[in-house]
Amino acid sequence: MNTKEFLKSLLNEYAPKDKDIKKIIAIISDEEKIGGDYKSTPGIPNLKLISHTGEPALQRAIFNKEQTILSDTKEVIEWPDLEIPVTLSKKSRRNCADLLGKSEDKLILAELKYRNSSKTDSPYYGIFELAVYYYLLTQNYVILDKYKVYHKKMPIDSNQFSWNKYIPLNKTRLIFVANKKYFDYWIGEKKIDINDLH
């Protein structure tokens, strides 16, 4: 069983626990999302005047801080870019990684979720979304490098950054990030069993 089929089997296994997982199954089943040779120049996100109070605000706050120190390992993560496409297609809306980070010789891909008072994606959804985005990167990194798909005016060093330095060498770490209220709701109120996420 190849990686794509393995992910699809996991997604189908968890689909009864979260009906929205069918959206992720649609992403990984879309052949246009793999190998599309279309040049892309992502627009620069607004980092100053942030009208949102939800996930975009959390994303900008982490990015604008430039560094995060993980409380458990004291590992320092630098955030050189955000909203990076992981696929190239004719469609104007493309799947993007929320945050791109670097820690020593590792690349960090972060998926963000935020809960205030409205409904939010479950941790099942967020973790599988992150896994599928990483899978898409493993299939598309050569073309993404070819077109230098990142934000040119961000702190990222365009002369040194290359997906090829990380993806084929398994030097990528996936991180799921959310605010406290999100985890209080999903884990604290036992909407899901945390052991189910291991």
Q: Where is each model-derived feature located?
A:
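Charged, terminal alpha-helix-loop-beta segments
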Residues: 1-198
